[in-house]
Amino acid sequence: MANMQSLTNIEVQRFHDCEWEYFKEFDDEFNKLWNEIEKTLGRDFINYLSAYFQKNLVYMLGKEFKLKLVVDTNIIFSQVLSYVTKGELPWILDFINNPFIELYAPQLIVDELKNKIENVLPKKCKKKNIDENKAKSKAIKIANIILSNIKIINDKKSNNWSKIAYNLIGHRDVKDIPFVTLALSLDTHGIITRDKDFKDQKIIKIWKVGEVKVVLTELSQGSFSFCIMNVTAPLAFKICTSIIITILEIVTSIIKKTN
């Protein structure tokens, strides 16, 4: 029990020991300077820089730079349901070509999603007078597409993390334990969910769908103040340093071409 408590304390410290204020001053100054550059050089040049950064930052920083999120079953099923009943393309598919975001889920999500398609979808179809067989076919197809772009992880070997996850959320819903276990064991930035059970714990950040969309929009627009909410200060400074170095490399390249 003592060992279990120490593990929990370590995780609490690790998740909360983020010296964001030290980085924020630098971030604010950077944005101020960046706005001046945008006014001087124009939007076309800024778009060029944005494309360049998105293409090269992942290469420079590797996997450290990616926003890693665990996604729960209800989020995926709601996407499937909207596609089948309303014809809306799942927003989660927008993540497929984004180099800065990775989605994860435990193996359990496959069975849970299948169960919801078999048992919950027919009830929804009946209310909306939608053909059940056609709806199931469409649901299975889009669910497979979504799952194929999520990293499904078998968490059977994460015993210590499972114990911590049980202590955090097991009293609310044991089915949520694999999702919390995965978020802890992979050192992710949180879980995308609408499930209120997850909010009982304070260790893992819980993301709303809208928050994730904002991050994606910020990335697409080339903003450099995006989403470093749960990243440690050293990595934050490493990111900024790499951005500055990249800018200097671009400027140097332009100067060489004009000489």
Swiss-Prot record:
For this UniProt entry, what is the primary localization, expressed as one broad class? membrane
Membrane topology of the entry: Single-pass membrane protein
Its subcellular locations are:
Membrane
GO CC terms for this protein?
Answer: membrane
Q: Name one Pfam family in it.
A: PIN_2
What keywords sit in the KW lines? Membrane, Plasmid, Transmembrane, Transmembrane helix
Q: Please tell me whether the keyword Kinase is annotated for this protein.
A: no
Q: Tell me the InterPro entries matching this sequence.
A: PIN-like_dom_sf, PIN_dom
List the transmembrane segments: 235-255
What's this protein's name? Answer: Uncharacterized protein MJECL38
Species source reads Methanocaldococcus jannaschii (strain ATCC 43067 / DSM 2661 / JAL-1 / JCM 10045 / NBRC 100440)
